[in-house]
Amino acid sequence: ALADSGQNMKDGIDLAVEEINAAGGISGRPIQIVYGDTQGANATGMTEMERLITQDKVMAVMGAYQSGVTEVVSQVAENYQVPMITANATSDSLTSHGYEYFFRLAPTNMMFIRDMEQYLLDLSAKDPADDIDVKSVAVCADNTELGQQTATWAKYFAEENGLEFKGEVLYSQGAADLTSEVLQLKSLNPDALIVDNYVSDAI
């Protein structure tokens, strides 16, 4: 379910490395990329991180895509004092451990939800005569730490902004059928839906 997203990121990295190396690399030295595949699993991610550091002798690590996997592999990188940077994972807790070798580029989940709800408010206020008038929200997300954070922050900022929080529908990641969840969301009948899904689940 996550393979397509992983391949898209790999394609982008390969293109960037090709362009950087064609321009002389970094301080005259070419970049060499070694890939590890977490397969979306914490244990596999930890094994791959160990391999990259102890066998491939990488100087730094980028990743991972999922917040849960990033949480555990960042511990491995920290133990080996190897710099790690994530551009994707958004869980609030990732930078709460005081690690010296872990860095994030992506905003936290709290920031995303705060800005989503502010956008909905701005959209509603932009043209009072428009059909968009958001007074209530609900959440659809997978039942992980990240999804639970999404629901918590959505409710918090809804109350802060005077919006009615209609509820949350959390599902098992990678579920083959989300019909019942869709029906639950329909019954909640929010003016806007805040979703935090991986691509295959969102489709």
Report each predicted region and the residues it spans.
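Extracytoplasmic ligand/sensor domains, especially the bilobed periplasmic-binding protein
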Residues: 58-168
